[in-house]
Amino acid sequence: MGGGNSLYVAARHQEKIAGLVLVNPMIHIPGMQIKFVHIISRIQKSRASVGDDIKKPGVTEWGYDALPLKGVAQLYKYLKLARTGLPSVKTPTLLFHSVDDHILPVSNTEIIMSELGASQKKRIELVNSFHVATLDYDAEMIFENSRLFIEEHSQ
């Protein structure tokens, strides 16, 4: 959800942002049932949470036990709003995407890369990490490439 937030802010406050670094960002929730989550949330209050999508043994991520469906409905609306701003985002962007992400489909990365208005955008595929890549095998590569990107764009 941090990627969607970053893109939303970048579309509205580009003058304050020198660059974006996104790791497995979310910009949409695929599937037909998401369109009805606001109705479903009146009947079913929550659903099982997602998390701990980490390839590296022994590493865990703290997360909620359940996701409130009213919150999921708000997230769906928010992501639609964030997506409308993608063409106006001209900020240089570095995007990391885990090839084997069990939480988000690759369509999130594809949408961002195709709809983002930035002329400077780079996608790096992570081949040895799941969704929570900053805690996984590719973490050091993410940190090093991010450091280089930040140095290049913070003048």
Where in the sequence are the language-model features?
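Active-site nucleophile elbow and catalytic-triad environment of alpha/beta-hydrolase enzymes
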Residues: 68-85
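Active-site signature of alpha/beta-hydrolase-fold catalytic machinery across serine-
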Residues: 8-12, 111
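Short beta-strand/loop motif that positions the catalytic acidic residue
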Residues: 88-89, 95-97, 101
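Catalytic active-site module of serine/aspartate enzymes centered on a nucleophile-bearing elbow/loop
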Residues: 127-155
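Catalytic histidine neighborhood in serine/cysteine hydrolases
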Residues: 110, 114-132
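Conserved alpha/beta-hydrolase "acid-adjacent" motif
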Residues: 102-108
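Gly/Ala-rich beta-loop-alpha elbow adjacent to hydrolase catalytic centers
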Residues: 2, 6
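Active-site nucleophile loop of the alpha/beta-hydrolase fold
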Residues: 9, 21-31
